[in-house]
Each structure stands twice: as C-alpha cells, then as structure tokens.
Regions:
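Classical Sec-dependent N-terminal signal peptides that target proteins to the secretory pathway
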Residues: 2-24
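Conserved beta-strand in the GNAT
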Residues: 65, 71-88
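A generic structural motif
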Residues: 66-70, 201-204
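Conserved acetyl-CoA pyrophosphate-binding loop and the N-cap/start of the following alpha-helix
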Residues: 93, 97-105, 189
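Conserved GNAT acetyl-CoA-binding A-motif
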Residues: 110-123
Length: 379
C-alpha cells in the first residue's frame, strides 16, 4: 500500500513539474517567493488580483509571483496549510500555460514541506484547468465554487473509512444523529448539546474539527471532549479530517463580502456533510443556537433549509445558560485572557477545568492571553 502511495505522488510530481518546461514561452518567466515585508510586490499582487476579480485571502502562509522578462508581475499564487489559493494570471497572458507553471511551483513547495494531499477551491468557470493538472472534484456549488483534491479517490476512501464505524452500530438503530464540533475549548454548553443528542438517539456520530488552527490544539480538544463525554456509551467519535473545515480558514477570495463567504462555506460544507451522512445513515443533525454569532446564524439558516431537502432533520438547540448568560467557548476564552481561571469553573466540565490548572494547560493559557479581542470573540 505504501509503495502505491509513493508511486502516485511521484507520478503527480512528474506530470506537474516536468510538463511546464515544454512550453517555449516559459524561457523568460521567473517564479519567485514574495514575503510580507515586500510592500511594493504585495501592492502589485493586490492590483493583479483586483484586475482579475479576486480578493486576497486573509489566510495565506506562502505567496509566489511570475515575472516576465521586464520584471513585471504577470501571475501569482499562494498556499495556506495544505491548500492552494489566490491563483491569478494577467488577462494579457492567459492561455500561455502560466497557471500550469505557478501550480507546479506551489505543489513543489507543498511537497518540500511535507504536504502531499493537497486541496484547491476554484471558480466554477476555471475548474477544468485544475482538472487537467491532476486535481479531482470533491463537491461543487453550481455556478460558484468547486472544491478539488489531488487524490483521485481521496474523498471516497475517506467515506469508506468512516463507514467502517457502522460495524459497531446497533443493527436495530433507527435514529442516528451527528454533531460537528470544534470545542475551543470544551464547555458545559457543548456537553449539554451532546447529552441531549445522545439521549434522543440510538447512535451519535461526533465529528471533532481536526484542523489545528484553533488556539486549543486538536489533540487537547479531542481529549477533553472524550473525557467529558465518557459516561455516554452510544457515541462514535470521528476526526473530521481535511474535508470539514471551520469558517475561520475557509477561503474568502471568491466573494465580494463577508456574507458571501459565509454562505459559500455553509453550502460547500453541507454538500460534504450530506455525503458523509449517507455513508453513515445519519438522519438528524444537532447544532447549537448562537444568537450573537453572524457566522453561525447564517450557517444554521442555510442548514435548516438544505438538510431536510436531503432527508436529514436539523435541530437547532437553545444554548445552555448560567446566571442568565449563554455559556460559550468565546466567553471562556475571554475569562482566561483576563486571568480569571476560577471564573470558568462553572462553565466547563471538570476535565476541562483540570486541564487549565495543570502544567500542560499553562501553555494554552499563555497563548490565549496573547490574543487580541477580535480573536477571542466568535463572529
């Protein structure tokens, strides 16, 4: 199995790295990285992206440009984690194979830093370009966005792996629920939602968002969730993997405003969830109401419409309160930032509180204290 994986990666590398140099137009093209302190080049990138109708994404950790022989920037592309983002070529040079060269460079960069399973979000009108470069469609929002990966059967293999958990299912189970949870950190509000879903259903599939962009690391979030729900015996735990991502890291460069970004994320995320639900026979999903969150409010509204269209019930559960205030992870983070660890004691399960007063918890506390107020609040 390992040799097959190496072979497929090697072939993808050959296809994307060797082919570009067969274009004679490439002789005078240079691909170079651009750093955040290069103000002039970054301003030129913004200009190019604007010309091509693309916003610069807020989440980028690497950017490159294509220079012509006169050192003009005629193309650009970026990465974030295991994704490729913000690809654009000047309209004057489109059709010359520059996209191929930029993508090849980005894939080489990703391989060099150990990322072999790659993803890209692209416009509906240009996804065929990436199909020709070895990327495969996962899901799409018609006339808007296509989500792609460089593994031919990557998502199908993920679904097959998930479906193995059905072997542990009660054969007579009729009510099979799901919750997708970040838990940054795990609170009594999260526990209330899980306990309700567990009580009202035969089986509960609990997906823990595994991308490590939250201030509380994934391994800690997973541990606290599992410890805090150990008394519930009908839960099947899943790492979300690379297919379910948070709104915080969803690419924003396709949409004109924040509302459009949230709607795109919700629609794409729910397309993926529906496929997961079918693989696991899930027929109901539980989510927590979050009246103060613009993101969750829009997401829940779309979900309440889309899931029933696919035969899945959607329950939006009123949030648990303490002294008239909603218990939320952002409120817990706020108290930690203020140094009020004792103040979270009645807002989190015992296992979460014990973590934050432990030596291991001190590192996370220090990171939370360094956050600005915008990063504390969940929008």
């Amino acid at each position: 199995m390992a040799s097959c994986k190496i072979f497929s990666i090697f072939n993808l590398f050959i296809i994307l790295i060797i082919i570009p140099f067969s274009y004679s137009d490439y002789e005078d093209i240079t691909i170079s990285p651009i750093y955040s302190n290069d103000k002039y080049s970054n301003s030129m990138i913004l200009k190019l992206l604007n010309q091509e109708g693309i916003k610069r994404d807020r989440n980028l950790d690497y950017t490159c440009v294509a220079y012509d022989s006169d050192y003009n920037i005629i193309g650009t592309g970026s990465c974030f984690g295991n994704t490729l983002r913000c690809l654009a070529v000047s309209h004057e040079h489109q059709g010359e194979g520059l996209t191929n060269k930029i993508v090849s460079h980005l894939i080489q960069y990703q391989f060099d830093r150990g990322n072999f399973h790659l993803f890209i979000y692209t416009k509906y009108t240009t996804y065929h370009l990436f199909k020709d470069l070895g990327f495969y469609e996962i899901v799409r929002i018609k006339d808007q966005i296509v989500f792609m990966e460089n593994k031919k059967n990557g998502f199908n293999d993920y679904l097959k792996e998930l479906s193995k958990s059905k072997l542990n299912d009660n054969a007579n189970a009729k009510k099979i629920a799901a919750i997708v949870m970040n838990a940054n950190p795990f609170t009594l509000g999260h526990l209330y939602l899980i306990e309700k879903a567990s009580k009202e259903n035969d089986i509960l599939h609990l997906f823990i968002v595994s991308e490590d962009k939250s201030i509380v690391p994934f391994n800690v979030r997973k541990k606290l969730i599992m410890e805090g729900t150990a008394h519930l015996k009908n839960i099947i735990y899943h790492d979300s993997g690379p297919y379910i991502i948070s709104s915080a890291t969803f690419p924003s460069y396709f949409q004109k405003d924040e509302k459009g970004v949230i709607e795109s994320h919700a629609n794409l995320d729910l397309e993926i969830f529906v496929k997961i639900a079918k693989a696991l026979n899930i027929n109901v999903r539980y989510v927590g109401e979050e009246p103060t969150s613009l993101v969750t409010g829009i997401y829940n509204k779309i979900m309440e419409k889309k899931l029933p269209e696919n035969g899945i019930e959607c329950f939006v559960v009123k949030r648990k309160e303490m002294d008239g205030n909603i218990i939320s992870a952002s409120e817990v983070r706020k108290k930690i930032k203020e140094g009020n660890i004792e103040g979270i004691k009645n807002m989190v399960p015992v296992s979460t509180y014990k973590f934050f007063i432990s030596e291991e918890g001190k590192n996370v506390i220090n990171k939370i204290k360094q956050l600005d107020d915008n990063d504390i609040k969940h929008y």
